[in-house]
Amino acid sequence: MAVFTAVSDSDLAQWMRHYELGDVLAFRGIPSGIENSNFFLTTTRGEYVLTIFEKLTAEQLPFYLDLMSHLAGHGVPVPDPIPRDDGALFGMLHGKPAAIVTKLDGSAELAPGVEHCIEVGQMLARLHLAGRDYPRNQPNLRSLPWWQENVPAIVPFITDEQRALLEGELVHQAGFFASDDYAALPAGPCHCDLFRDNVLFAHAAPDTGHDVRLGGFFDFYFAGCDKWLFDVAVTVNDWCVDLATGVLDVARADALLRAYQTVRPFTAEERRHWSDMLRAGAYRFWVSRLYDFYLPRAAEMLKPHDPGHFERILRERIAHTPALPEIQTACN
């Protein structure tokens, strides 16, 4: 969510003519992230987010925006795209597709505890089940084919030890993806990027008995149809780790995974390949962070992520991964 494309006051005024959102009160760029240009937009009708899509094409974009509308319609708290005056969910701004979505309540919890992980686990399972009847199909664009395409471009910049890990894990994952067990894993629309800064929490009502309330999931622009276990692995690799070492926090991981299973129990194949999928989740973000670090795009505001974080996580997952926790029958 960096700003690669600037939007002037006159650009915004022209753009807003296609929406019935009242008068603009405030507009500012969002500096975090690395993929799209994002802006907070406040009008007399409410608070929104304007996104200019720097890589996604007009042909690809309906998958993401329609998925968000679908999930919102099924009670999953996600940003809801706002239709334009012609009924479309996006238009063109500076020659690039752009959209306005509702802004969720709450703030990110960057130091999550067990209760936060329980909320995330349950809602992620609800998201997966809500997407089962979503009619569009688009693969996760940052999966195995993307890794195979981009790893060669990264290799000249890294050490021999890193290269051995990067290329060796790619061989391992290619074999896993080609297996019958992988083909049997449950799949459907996935968020694919459910990090702690893509989830908002609000204060719970006093009569609920809870300290936190999930405000919603956002930033669906890496979403795709993938194995649900991959989505869980990506989530656990961020929500349930010690940030300094990449080691899993067993209490948080156990809480998230048990909460997920109260909504959707894991299959036998998923249990067998939990370690492989945690490695896949770590590998995906190590590759993308290496690529963005060594081959960056120009941006007005950009905060690059540390590739070493996911290298540490990958090494940890190769060395040790606890089994998926069992749950009591009464919780099913």
Swiss-Prot record:
Query: Pathway it belongs to?
Result: Amino-acid biosynthesis; L-threonine biosynthesis; L-threonine from L-aspartate: step 4/5
Q: Which E.C. number(s) belong to this protein?
A: 2.7.1.39
Q: Name one GO molecular function term.
A: homoserine kinase activity
**By its UniProt entry, which Pfam families does this protein fall under?**
APH
BP-aspect Gene Ontology terms: threonine biosynthetic process
- InterPro entries from the xrefs? Aminoglycoside_PTrfase, Homoserine_kinase_II, Kinase-like_dom_sf, Pseudomonas-type_ThrB
Catalytic reactions on record: L-homoserine + ATP = O-phospho-L-homoserine + ADP + H(+)
Record keywords: Amino-acid biosynthesis, ATP-binding, Kinase, Nucleotide-binding, Threonine biosynthesis, Transferase
The Swiss-Prot or TrEMBL record describes its family as follows: Belongs to the pseudomonas-type ThrB family.
The protein's name is: Homoserine kinase
Organism listed in the record: Burkholderia lata (strain ATCC 17760 / DSM 23089 / LMG 22485 / NCIMB 9086 / R18194 / 383)
* Name of the gene: thrB
